[in-house]
């Protein structure tokens, strides 16, 4: 039996629109990433700790070729809500600075959605016309066996979809994280699509690769100005 919802009261369905469309396989929000002004990470970490009893679970200091960022991942007591805090690690027109200017202040940079079959989910996203971030170069996939020996994933399937793979295979135990990002969709805000196979991190191994790819995109768009001698 159909159970009435608040949407039945506050909204009217358009004619010819499926009221229960088939989704793309995503189940829950895995995490939200919060971009803050340089020097404000401690303020926001304290805010989440005092009001919601969050605690720090990860800290990253990512350096690109020209810019960098620091990231502190916070989690709720039950582990169900996770919010990494990002700030620019040095002055300049880095990715966080560009976001803050476009968003007119601090806010959520991206929303990560969890699936249990990222291959099928990405195929559905592409079929639906969802714009995804440019895939990494083929060298990324050729280096996977060196970085994650015996990871067990189909590398051709990963490359065909532009999926990133992270985690560990130490002691023959596979703890993997598969992820891909959309293009910006809500102003400067974008989405991350993720599948966890025993890994509860945030793709630290991919973090630097993603950061550098975004840095290259900034250079190509003319947002990040670099010295030609330094770029050579």
Language-model features, listed with the residues they occupy:
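N-terminal beta-strand motif that seeds the catalytic metal site of vicinal oxygen chelate
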Residues: 6-45, 104-113, 206-216, 220-232
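Active-site-adjacent "gating/activation" loops or surface patches in catalytic cores
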Residues: 78-96
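Core segments of cupin and vicinal oxygen chelate
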Residues: 36-82, 120-123, 127-130, 135-149, ...
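Short, small-residue-biased leader/transition segments that mark boundaries at the very start
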Residues: 1-2
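Low-complexity, glycine/alanine/valine/leucine- and proline-rich hydrophobic stretches
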Residues: 186, 194-217
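Active-site/pore-lining binding-face segments in mid-to-C-terminal subdomains
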Residues: 96, 102, 109-186
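Short, structured motif recognition centered on aromatic/hydrophobic residues
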Residues: 29-33, 48, 54, 83-85, ...
């Amino acid at each position: 039996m159909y159970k009435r919802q608040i949407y039945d009261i506050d909204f009217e369905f358009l004619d010819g629109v499926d009221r229960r469309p088939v989704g793309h396989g995503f189940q829950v929000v895995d995490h939200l990433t919060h971009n803050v002004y340089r020097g404000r990470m401690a303020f926001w970490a304290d805010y989440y700790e005092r009001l919601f009893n969050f605690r720090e679970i990860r800290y990253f200091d990512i350096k690109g070729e020209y810019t960098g960022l620091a990231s502190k991942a916070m989690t709720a007591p039950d582990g169900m809500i996770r919010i990494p805090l990002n700030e620019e690690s040095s002055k300049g027109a880095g990715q966080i600075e560009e976001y803050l200017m476009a968003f007119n202040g601090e806010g959520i940079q991206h929303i990560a959605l969890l699936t249990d079959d990222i291959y099928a989910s990405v195929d559905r996203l592409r079929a639906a016309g969802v714009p995804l971030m440019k895939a990494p170069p083929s060298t990324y996939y050729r280096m996977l066996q060196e970085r994650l020996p015996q990871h067990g994933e189909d590398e051709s399937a990963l490359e065909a979809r532009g999926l990133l793979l992270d985690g560990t295979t130490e002691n023959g135990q596979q703890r993997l994280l598969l992820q891909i990002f959309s293009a910006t969709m809500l102003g400067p805000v974008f989405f991350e699509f993720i599948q966890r196979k025993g890994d509860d991190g945030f793709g630290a191994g991919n973090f630097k690769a993603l950061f550098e790819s975004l840095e290259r995109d900034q250079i190509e768009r003319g947002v990040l100005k670099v010295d030609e001698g330094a770029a050579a």
